[in-house]
Amino acid sequence: AIAAARLGAARVAAIELDHDAIGNAEENVARNHAQDAVHVIEGDAGTLLPLLAPVRVILANIISSVLLDLSAGMLAALTPDGEAILSGMLATEREPLRHELECGGWRIGAERVEGDWWSCVLSPR
């Protein structure tokens, strides 16, 4: 969220499910002077994304099981020209995830495997 603000995003919603992480997230936003753009919201992304839609970009560091649970909601929340930039998925899960995402209506763009981790850029088909 902070990186998005530094790169010029005027409005960033940082969704955090873990109540204990909210204070740290807000401190990091303040420490990086990003509070005008970044708003930390406590809650479930599956519930909040439809309320925030339409969005141009979704950034998420997310494990594969949560990604699959949120996939349809993320797709519905994006503008037709939007992108989801994802990291935090195990490289060993790359192929089955690719298959599930493509079957779920996503086009997979840039990808990167670094050590044990896979990241990718998705867009609606």
Regions found by a protein language model. Give the residues of each.
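Short alpha-helix immediately C-terminal to the canonical SAM-binding loop
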Residues: 22-23, 67, 94
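A short SAM/SAH-binding and catalytic strip from SAM-dependent methyltransferases
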Residues: 56-69, 88
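ADP-ribose/adenylate-binding Rossmann-like module
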Residues: 81-94
